[in-house]
Amino acid sequence: MIPQDPVMLLSFINLKLRDFYGSLKQLCDDLDVKEQEITDKLAAIDYNYDEERNQFV
């Protein structure tokens, strides 16, 4: 289960992307979550996925 709080979600997702996954798609497939759900929640706190850096910035 992923954190529901956007700030905690940001930390959780960026850690997972840095340490375990080569892309947001891989992370979402593995954790069985919708990519749009994550991007929408993090966009609400002004963070967007940067494919080149493989993190939300």
Regions found by a protein language model. Name each.
Residues 1-23:
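N-terminal acidic leader/helix
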Residues 32-57:
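Short, charge-rich amphipathic interface segments used for partner binding and complex assembly
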